[in-house]
Amino acid sequence: KRMIMTRKNLILLLFSLLTLNSCNKHEGPELRFCENYIQNYCQGDLVLLSRSPDRPPQIPADPQTPIRNFWIELTDCEWISPESDPQEFERLAIRNGDVGYNRWLEFWEYPSAFADNFQTMHITSNADWDEEHPAGTLLDDILWAEFWSYADYIRSGYETGGGNNVQMLVEDLKADDMQMIRDYVIIYFTKTPTIDPIHTLTVEWTTVEGEVKTASLTCRPQVNAKE
């Protein structure tokens, strides 16, 4: 009888634990009911990385190493969330029209974005790229931008699938394309330099408020370089 009671108690204990885990899954910190889709905004200084942020070293010591693309990120990022800065978070959410999501989100899928929205991007080099692109002239027509934007999804009333992958030449980017951007941008080279092989590239990214954010990277651009 004692053995039977022990087994029964064990079964009840296991059932209670399963029930408790189920409740935690819906009520715990890993799942939260969110009024806003974007849950984290990043505010910081612009930085250019020659490798993916997930693949160190991010900036090789040797600029002779050929690269086929570079990443635009923020360094010393200050994360703005409903917990860290409720007032600023609310201001950004209202600015973006992101105030009616009202759905459950798991912690690992919380969307993050640049705190700034942008109106123009321009990229130059300190060296001669080719005959059409001497030092100091815009390279916007030979650089390809790729990034994720949440703007269409939010503006559609959260009906279009989570956002859209923006892919176009830098010269074709408009202000509407550079709103509510996920927290990095990748720039690909579409031409390998034919004059000077080493370039210090400078990105000038202007916010909708008119602030110009700049960053530079010395590198060896090469279209067919290994990732």
Label every PLM stretch briefly:
Residues 10-18:
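Sec-dependent N-terminal signal peptides
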Residues 24-227:
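Non-catalytic macromolecular-recognition regions in eukaryotic signaling proteins
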Residues 1-4:
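Short, Lys/Arg-enriched N-terminal segments with co-localized hydrophobic residues
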Residues 6-8:
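Elongated, non-catalytic scaffold/linker segments and compositionally distinctive motifs
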Residues 20-22:
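C-terminal motif of bacterial Sec signal peptides marking the signal peptidase cleavage site
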